[in-house]
From Swiss-Prot:
Belongs to the ZIP transporter (TC 2.A.5) family. KE4/Catsup subfamily. The modification Pros-methylhistidine is found at H66. The modification Phosphoserine is found at S275, S276. Induction: Down-regulated by Zn(+2). It is linked to Agammaglobulinemia 9, autosomal recessive: A form of agammaglobulinemia, a primary immunodeficiency characterized by profoundly low or absent serum antibodies and low or absent circulating B-cells due to an early block of B-cell development. Affected individuals develop severe infections in the first years of life. The gene is SLC39A7. This is Zinc transporter SLC39A7. Homodimer.
Length: 469
């Protein structure tokens, strides 16, 4: 027993160590960001204050309000001394206008310097990359992020969904559920909401809150539509496969269903065993009298095998649904990589590293779901390799689009409004309907603790990746 639990302990310790190091890195990064923000706020406040004092002193230096009024309005009139106080008030409003002009100029300078920094930070901007080099970089990066996780999958000591690997597989499934939920709520949905939030912040006035609710509401509806679509697909597949299963053993399934509602479940099972034994005796007597073997010996037991076969088919549906969601997700990753390489070689490399860090834990979770669905290790890896087609298609789409418009919108979170939230809905459905129920099986307290830690490890990984992005 101790030898069997060695691998789960090792995986749990590795996940906890990885999460702890990530939290330390995130804490240091957050401290630096806070220091930069405080320094920027102090610099901006001091500069604005000195400028405002200088302008206020300038308004007092004029002495007479009518001269400043004539400069502001462009005409000259005679004013008495009693009106000069009103003119000073106008001079104060002029100072406010000048301050707003300073803010606009400062924002323009900041934007210009930021753009210059981006060009200098990316050593190879898109004008320096010809078409062949651009395609080579983008497709090579896509192949890298698709093939790199397989080196990690080779190290996982899980060959199939067997009792010998059940404890480790349950921990990997919990890690997969945490990764799927974290990816949906911390990566896909926030990226889909980012352009809408920026749009509402840029609009002045108090009427933007109503106009900004439409796009945000559409993102939520697309998430729900993804959940409903995956539910409809799974029910349809189960209906097709279920009708085939009931044709083999309808009587056994019906009696077993009725027996599960009563409190005497053991009595029902013993009666079924007795009836099956009687049927076996009758069939053997018929075979002896006829001198042939028209009925197989395992005939009465076949409905039970058909029921198990139906359950296996139902489990494979969840694996295929997860592959469909992963295919759409890889398509968006390919769009982001293609658009980033159009913006520059440095930006493309940075985006590739970010997507790679995101894909490794995600592919480990997908592997666990496929193995739990009934696939062997080789079959699961082959099916995951097919999802790389989605990433290559996304990269090609971003490179073929004029100016990389579609790819840049997807990379920034805008894109077609249904891609990211619909994929998030699929991830939420797979995690909550297909994966989490498998973790509710009876287990030892230590195994349950490791499963909870695995789920938290998957969420923490997505938190760290979102922080790096």
């Amino acid at each position: 027993m101790a030898r069997g639990l060695g691998a789960p302990h090792w995986v749990a310790v590795g996940l906890l160590t990885w999460a702890t190091l990530g939290l330390l890195v995130a804490g240091l990064g957050g401290h630096d960001d806070l220091h930069d923000d405080l320094q920027e706020d102090f610099h901006g406040h001091s500069h604005r204050h000195s400028h405002e004092d200088f302008h206020h002193g300038h308004s007092h230096a004029h002495g007479h309000g009518h001269t400043h009024e004539s400069i502001w309005h462009g005409h000259t009139h005679d004013h008495d001394h009693g009106h000069s106080h009103e003119d000073l008030h106008h001079g104060h409003s002029h100072g406010y206008s000048h301050e707003s002009l300073y803010h606009r100029g400062h924002g323009h300078d900041h934007e210009h310097s930021h753009g210059g920094y981006g060009e200098s930070g990316a050593p190879g901007i898109k004008q320096d990359l010809d078409a062949v080099t651009l395609w080579a970089y983008a497709l090579g990066a896509t192949v890298l992020i698709s093939a790199a996780p397989f080196f990690v999958l080779f190290l996982i000591p899980v060959e199939s969904n067997s009792p010998r690997h059940r404890s480790l597989l349950q921990i990997l499934l919990s890690f997969a559920s945490g990764g799927l939920l974290g990816d949906a709520f911390l990566h896909l949905i926030p990226h889909a909401l980012e352009p809408h939030s920026h749009h509402t912040l840029e609009q002045p006035g108090h009427g933007h809150s109503h106009s900004g609710q439409g796009p945000i509401l559409s993102v939520g509806l697309w998430v729900l539509s993804g959940i409903v679509a995956f539910l409809v697909v799974e029910k349809f597949v189960r209906h097709v496969k279920g009708g085939h299963g009931h044709s083999h053993g309808h009587g056994h399934a019906h009696s077993h269903t009725r027996g599960s509602h009563g409190h005497g479940r053991q009595e029902r099972s013993t009666k079924e065993k007795q009836s099956s034994e009687e049927e076996e005796k009758e069939t053997r007597g018929v075979q002896k009298r006829r001198g042939g073997s028209t009925v197989p010996k395992d005939g009465p037991v076949r409905p039970q095998n058909a029921e198990e076969e139906k359950r296996g088919l139902d489990l494979r549906v969840s694996g295929y649904l997860n592959l469909a969601a992963d295919l759409a997700h890889n398509f968006t990753d390919g769009l982001a990589i293609g658009a980033s390489f159009r913006g520059g070689r440095g930006l493309g490399i940075l985006t590739t590293m970010t997507v790679l860090l995101h894909e490794v834990p995600h592919e480990v979770g997908d592997f666990a779901i496929l193995v739990q669905s009934g696939c062997s290790k080789k079959q699961a890896m082959r099916l995951q390799l097919l999802t790389a087609v989605g990433a290559l298609a996304g990269t090609a789409c971003a490179l073929l689009t004029e100016g990389g418009a579609v790819g840049s919108e997807i990379a920034g979170g805008a894109g077609p409004g249904w891609v990211l939230p619909f994929t998030a809905g699929g991830f939420i459905y797979v995690a909550t309907v297909s994966v989490l129920p498998e973790l509710l099986r009876e287990a030892s307290p230590l195994q349950s603790l490791l499963e909870v830690l695995g789920l938290l490890g998957g969420v923490i990984m997505m938190v760290l990746i979102a922080h790096l992005e």
